[in-house]
């Protein structure tokens, strides 16, 4: 299963739509990890399973989602409610509570992937205001049973090999 994962687009609608259209025929799910700053009914948000970030005012967005992706559970949240700028520990505990092996989150605007205690944490970075690098990024997540490919792309659609990686879940 392939999943498009974006976060922290902060009001961008045209660019978000371009990214979605670029991959819509290749992915089975699209996830927005919050801070879209767009109403849930906005055209650019159509097709996205989205959560509420600290800058989102639309209460139609939930604080988190648990999605079934093949054999794996995926936990999606923005991250501000779990203090992710300081530690992933709170998010790790929540992932264990919902039996998720993969966690997608945003908030920090820092693109990166980390395996901790058998759980894969993925922050796709920001489509608008990246931190720690100049590239505005998103992720295509490819889950095949226990094998996971995490490919980072620039907003222009070019793969970023230095951020991309593969994992095998326990």
Predicted regions and their residues:
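Active-site metal-binding loops of divalent metal-dependent hydrolases
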Residues: 7-10, 34-36, 54-56, 79-81, ...
């Amino acid at each position: 299963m392939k999943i498009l994962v974006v976060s922290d687009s902060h009001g961008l609608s045209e660019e978000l739509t371009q990214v979605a259209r670029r991959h819509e025929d290749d992915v089975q799910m699209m996830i927005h990890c919050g801070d879209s700053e767009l109403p849930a009914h906005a055209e650019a948000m159509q097709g996205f399973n989205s959560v509420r970030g600290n800058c989102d005012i639309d209460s139609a967005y939930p604080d988190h989602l648990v999605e079934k992706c093949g054999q794996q559970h995926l936990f999606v949240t923005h991250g501000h409610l779990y203090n992710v700028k300081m530690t992933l520990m709170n998010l790790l505990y929540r992932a264990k509570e919902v039996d998720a092996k993969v966690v997608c989150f945003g908030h920090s605007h820092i693109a990166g992937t980390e395996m901790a205690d058998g759980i894969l944490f993925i922050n796709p970075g920001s489509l608008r205001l990246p931190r720690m690098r100049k590239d505005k990024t998103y992720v295509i997540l490819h889950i095949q049973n226990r094998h996971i490919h995490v490919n980072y792309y620039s907003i222009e659609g070019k793969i970023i090999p230095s951020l991309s990686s593969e994992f095998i879940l326990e």
